[in-house]
């Protein structure tokens, strides 16, 4: 079976290449992908050949997406052919073969595939929020309102944090954060940034902060 898959074949170079789908082993699941999600941090770093990557080309990337089960191995019992499933560590390709443990059936038919495709990457934002152990009514800040940050902002709102302060240099991201649950959205380059945070929190500062800017200096 022919497959099409995105590979990074060099710095600044991505190609859609053809390869063959392998044989499904006894504990594996073959899925035909509907959506895969681009991780801005990982994919960008690899495409630019940054120092925190292997720089070994060609490389295939991708770790979250959704599709439908095409075939299962003889020992697979959690999913069946035709099931809509989340695929962890699946690549940006038409077909993926992954171990059963990397496959999760989507039980809720009211959730669209496009929405469900983000569950895996959203869970990373949730992980940051859970580590804070924020209590009801405690203040929290999210530094960076990219994909992970905007999810963390929403999870803090759902966790009962107040106020939720979103921080980003980009005005459009700050506006989106306010629409999705932030009580305040601040520009960290504002000379009054620190004082504004103190004013919002009655001089105490925030109880917890999730830092997802992707910038080491932050």
Regions found by a protein language model. Name each.
Residues 1-4:
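Extreme N-terminal starter segment of soluble prokaryotic enzymes
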Residues 10-12, 25:
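Residue-level recognition of beta-strand termini and adjacent short loop/turns
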Residues 22-38, 49-91:
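Glycine-rich beta-strand-centered segment in the early N-terminal region that forms part
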Residues 89-100:
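A structural motif shared across PLP-dependent enzymes of the aminotransferase-like
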Residues 102-114, 200, 204:
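Glycine/charged-rich beta-loop-alpha catalytic/anionic-binding loops adjacent to active sites
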Residues 115-190, 195:
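Mid-domain Rossmann-like dinucleotide-binding core that forms the NAD(H)/NADP(H) cofactor-binding site
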Residues 180-218:
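Glycine-rich cofactor phosphate-binding loops and adjacent beta1-alpha1 units
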């Amino acid at each position: 079976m022919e497959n099409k898959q995105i590979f990074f074949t060099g710095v600044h170079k991505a190609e859609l290449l053809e390869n063959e789908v392998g044989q499904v082993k006894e504990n594996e699941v073959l899925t035909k992908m509907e959506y895969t999600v681009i991780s801005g941090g990982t994919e960008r770093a690899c495409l630019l050949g940054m120092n925190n990557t292997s720089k070994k080309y060609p490389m295939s990337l991708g770790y979250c997406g959704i599709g439908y089960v095409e075939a299962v191995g003889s020992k697979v019992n959690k999913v069946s052919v035709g099931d809509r499933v989340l695929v962890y560590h699946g690549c940006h390709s038409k077909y993926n073969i992954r171990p059963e443990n990397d496959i999760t059936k989507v039980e809720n038919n009211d959730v669209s595939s496009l929405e469900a495709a983000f569950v895996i990457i959203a869970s990373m934002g949730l992980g940051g929020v859970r580590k804070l152990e924020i209590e009801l009514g405690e203040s929290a800040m999210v530094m960076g309102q990219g994909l992970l940050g905007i999810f963390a902002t929403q999870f803090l709102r759902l966790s009962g944090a107040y106020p939720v302060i979103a921080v980003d240099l980009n005005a459009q991201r700050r506006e989106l954060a306010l629409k999705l649950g932030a009580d305040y959205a601040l520009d960290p380059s504002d000379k009054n940034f620190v004082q504004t945070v103190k004013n919002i929190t009655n001089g105490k500062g925030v109880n917890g902060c999730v830092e997802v800017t992707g910038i080491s200096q932050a």
